[in-house]
Amino acid sequence: IIAEPWDSTTDTAISTRVSKLFADYGRNFYGFITATSATVSDDEILKIAQIVESSADSHIYGITLTDLACANSVYTDESTDLPSKLKRGQFTRTIVFASEYDANDSAYRLNKYLVASALGRMFSVNFSGSMTTITLKFKQAPSLQPTNLTQSQDTNLSARNVNKYAIYSNDTYIIQEGVMSSGMWADERHGSDWLQDLIQTTVYNVLYQSKTKIPQTDDGVARLMAAVANAIDQAVINGFVAPGVWNSDPFGDLESGAYLEKGYYLYAPSVNDQLQNEREARKSPVIQAGIKLAGAIHSVPIIVNINR
């Protein structure tokens, strides 16, 4: 855990501190929140979100919204509240939670850290196991109080891609919906970052651990592709990737509508087709992967036909 104290009355802008934190320790952490009793302005939060989005290293930035004023207004393209700006900015690495908070009420005092609880649950996933991946929806936030929202408030927050820890009519408390500010599912953001890191590490280890070299030949590229396949196989084992129909653009021999029996498809052109300058720079031909995510079921339509 890296803690950076900040005092709004004496310190430089918090976004400046975050930039320095990234420069000094960016590869040593993944998720972070702005946890401070001082007020962080919307402009500063937007700057931090931009820093996170453009960072060379993968990070997730969490915000707990304790001012629920935006829950009382319908979202439009002209809405000026913070969640609306983050949504329109299509920030895929920022996640916002709304939570009822009262500094004078011991039951609600910790609610300003709701996003920390949610990220803690998400980051506890062990991707090395079998069927271990999760969806953030339906999870609990131990020791924190749910927010009692009206239907219209819930709708208004959801329209802004704001998550909640809500009370349901069957007396259960759950996190919903589990999305980033862009609308991307949070578990897919997390899983994609994990898989990217695993592929990079696995391929690097092939180069690093070879007692001779990986030749710049089709056989050499095949060894690298095997390493990529190894990494994605673990994503199949842990439930992040699954067999399914490829509905995106075609590439290589993969056509739109094709069924991916393994959950993924790998392609690399022949070394013989490489540009000479790439060959002289000792680059591998580009390796492409088409991956089908397993997704998650969040709702169930049920039709009951009754006959007498």
Model-derived features: positions:
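Structured, hydrophobic secondary-structure cores that serve as assembly/anchoring elements
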Residues: 177-308
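A broadly used, surface-exposed interaction patch
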Residues: 1-21
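A structural detector for beta-sheet-dominated domains
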Residues: 4, 35, 267-269
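Residues that cap or initiate secondary-structure elements
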Residues: 9, 38-40, 68, 272, ...
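A glycine- and small-residue-enriched flexible loop/hinge signal that marks low-structured segments
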Residues: 24-212, 243-245, 249-265
